[in-house]
Amino acid sequence: MSDQVYNSYIQHFNAYEAKALKLIIAEFRKQLRGLKFDNLTFDNAKYVIVLNIDEESLKETIYKVDYTIGKAYGTFIAKQLRKENPIQLKKWRPLPFFNEAFQQFLIQYYAKFGGTLIRSLSETMTAAVVAEISKGTYENETVEQMRDRIYKTVNKRDFYLWQAMRIARTETGFAMNSAKEIAGQTSGVLMQKIWIGRNDGRERSSHVHANGQKVDQDKMFSVGGVKMKYPGDRENGTAKETVNCRCTFGYEAKRDENGGLIFTD
């Protein structure tokens, strides 16, 4: 079961991540081209950059990534659960329950954590530009030379590609797994969750140890001493356990003594 679930997850993940990366690269390009380099000096660089980043535009882009990926994948999972467990199909809650619940989840998530998330992204972008500026201080650049060099550097795709890739991967995992969590919650069927990852040399040791861990649907996984509802759970997890995570989880429906599904309603 775990191999099949993970392979399906990664296939979807790679496709969604590519779409997310395009959106994030376009946003980074727009943000960096909008910086006021004419007013930039060694002393005021950080403040000028922070003040010129359009956090609302950045937030809209990341929300779009989370919503479009989560809605698409969550709908797929909801349909897949019904396909795998066709018994008493009419008792399953209809898909609009998922759509409404996922949208509500994202609205509440961004209301609570959106400011911190976007501020973190803008600070990451600022730090990258400031680090590039500092390179010239050892070469006795004039302010004019520094401005010219920074303008050329930050407008190269390679400058922000790594950051964009990290964000795309993190957001894709968050959107997919949070949507899968909600698809299970709104199904109307009692299930258990199983943490699924790959010990391929790239995975965190804490996630390797979590592989195969099984909990009830309304319970939390214990990963690296942290409680999380699902892989990439930023509400409860730490950056150490969520950034760049490629893990997922699977569902196993609970059954009664006759082998039938157990419905919550």
PLM region descriptions:
Residues 1-158, 252-265:
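N-terminal leader/targeting and assembly helices and adjacent pre-domain segments
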Residues 159-265:
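Acidic, glycine-rich two-metal-ion catalytic cores of nucleic acid-processing enzymes
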